[in-house]
Amino acid sequence: MRAQASVVLDHHLAECGGAVAGTVRWHGNGRRQRVGVVLRYRTEGRGDVDTDVVAAVELGDADAGESRFRLDVPPLGPVTYNGRLLRLLWVVAVQIPANRSFLGTAATADLTVVPNGWLR
């Protein structure tokens, strides 16, 4: 059986240089693989597709659990952009096993990243 997970963000909006926090729940990790949370962005549209993991935290290898997390958003972003030719999207993903690839993604939550100072 494949492990199942869910992620709930405290807020779906974060500033460059700020942080995103939330709660992860998982169960069915009978193979005791590492559970992790990553913050990553990806581009879509014309041209090359790009993706990068900018922050990650491991939560352990329990069969089931619930854990709080906090991931730092880079000070220089990039910010979320939704244009006609290009989109830049952010996501928080639960990964079982915990690694920096897209393999093993068990749950995701979308995030909007805005320039520093916009939320004041």
Spans of features found by a protein language model:
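C-terminal beta-sandwich interaction modules and adjacent acidic
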Residues: M1-R120
